[in-house]
């Protein structure tokens, strides 16, 4: 016997919402999913009329659903936003080159301008080349740092007021877990923020999908027949986040509400005054936002260019010793060449 839609629309239920457990027809699920994102946007005052917003587009399910829903809500509720797509090409063969084709399809489907920036044009390196130098143990560190700065650079080029990213509820719960396990209070106190950055030298980032379950995003994309790229990054299986994700999935089997429980717990955390946030300024080399001098992106890039790919991994003092040792070796070689030339 078919189950009726809980919204009492008179139709048979087609699915069970992972977030609430409600049995809904497709149309009522779409309405509920979109209404929740609209509530997140309006209650958190993420945008103001007349603003230009860059939607961070990777071609995956999250960014595709974000672009679709942002366009739909912008028109339905008259937000008055100018929407553009911003995509970063990390240079990962067999992954990003294929997903960019999906991004271009999103551009055509949603009639949004698209800007693509590559690591190669920004840093002179691709992730394929970086991994060939460092192996697969720390590749996500390089990619994450470069990607964050690349989005800032792209946003500055496009003169946008904010960047909307596709971080969903699962992503944020995973990040809370990771920061707890690492004892990183500085990141823990801000990882649940729906808006980060902002100020004179940085462009704010917002998360309209903060309270949207990953399973529901997949269901929405499936039933809406949205075009998205579903292949996982070839370097992702080695990431530390994967362990937090697996742990979270196990917890979810026992307690379905665990994702929202973790997010709400993260939002309610209180820290002693002694646990200070890092002071954010601008990098004295590249001029982009940073809490250290030089910024992490510049340190990692210097390591690659010097042939010391592990320079930016670990404590700053370790990197300083590596630079000092290399400079000393170069000085000794130059001195030896001078002596040789004298004879």
From Swiss-Prot:
Keywords tagged on the record: Cytoplasm, RNA-binding, Transferase, tRNA processing, tRNA-binding
Chain's role: Plays a central role in 2-thiolation of mcm(5)S(2)U at tRNA wobble positions of tRNA(Lys), tRNA(Glu) and tRNA(Gln). Directly binds tRNAs and probably acts by catalyzing adenylation of tRNAs, an intermediate required for 2-thiolation. It is unclear whether it acts as a sulfurtransferase that transfers sulfur from thiocarboxylated URM1 onto the uridine of tRNAs at wobble position.
Presence of the UniProt keyword Cell wall biogenesis/degradation in the record: no
Associated pathway: tRNA modification; 5-methoxycarbonylmethyl-2-thiouridine-tRNA biosynthesis
Protein EC: 2.7.7.-
GO cellular component: cytosol; cytosolic tRNA wobble base thiouridylase complex; mitochondrion
One GO process term, biological-process aspect: tRNA thio-modification
Record's protein name: Cytoplasmic tRNA 2-thiolation protein 1
InterPro entries: CTU1-like_ATP-bd (IPR056369), CTU1_C (IPR032442), Ncs6/Tuc1/Ctu1 (IPR000541), Rossmann-like_a/b/a_fold (IPR014729), TilS/TtcA_N (IPR011063), tRNA_thiolation_TtcA_Ctu1 (IPR035107), UPF0021_CS (IPR020554)
Keyword Transferase applies: yes
A Pfam short name: zn-ribbon_14
Intracellular or extracellular location(s): Cytoplasm
């Amino acid at each position: 016997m078919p189950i009726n839609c809980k919204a009492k629309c008179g139709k048979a239920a087609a699915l069970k919402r992972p977030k609430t457990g409600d049995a809904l027809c497709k149309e009522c699920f779409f309405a509920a999913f979109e209404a929740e994102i609209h509530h997140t946007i309006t209650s958190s005052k993420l945008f103001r009329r007349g603003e230009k917003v860059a939607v961070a587009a990777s071609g995956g399910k999250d960014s595709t659903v974000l672009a679709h829903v942002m366009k739909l809500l912008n028109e339905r509720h008259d937000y008055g936003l100018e929407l553009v797509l911003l995509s970063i090409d990390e240079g990962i063969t067999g992954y990003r080159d294929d997903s960019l084709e999906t991004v271009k399809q999103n551009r055509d489907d949603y009639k949004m301008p698209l800007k693509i920036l590559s690591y190669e044009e920004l840093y002179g390196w691709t992730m394929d080349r970086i991994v060939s130098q460092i192996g697969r143990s720390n590749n996500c560190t390089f990619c994450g740092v470069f990607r964050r700065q690349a989005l800032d650079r792209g946003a500055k080029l496009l003169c946008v007021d904010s960047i909307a990213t596709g971080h969903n509820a699962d992503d944020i719960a995973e990040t809370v877990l990771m920061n707890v396990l690492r004892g990183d209070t500085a990141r823990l106190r801000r990882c649940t923020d729906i808006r980060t950055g902002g100020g004179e030298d940085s462009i704010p980032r917002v998360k309209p999908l903060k309270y949207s379950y990953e399973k529901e995003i997949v269901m929405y994309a499936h039933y809406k027949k949205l075009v998205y790229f579903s292949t996982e990054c070839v370097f992702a299986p080695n990431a530390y986040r994967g362990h937090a994700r697996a742990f979270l999935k196990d917890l979810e089997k026992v307690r379905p509400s665990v994702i929202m429980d973790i997010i709400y717990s993260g939002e309610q955390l209180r820290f002693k005054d002694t646990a200070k946030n890092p002071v954010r300024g601008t990098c004295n080399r590249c001029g982009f936002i940073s809490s250290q001098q030089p910024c992490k992106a510049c340190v990692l890039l210097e390591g690659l260019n010097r042939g010391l790919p592990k320079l930016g991994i670990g404590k700053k003092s370790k990197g300083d010793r590596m630079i000092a040792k290399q400079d000393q070796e170069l000085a000794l070689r130059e001195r030896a060449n001078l002596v040789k030339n004298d004879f």
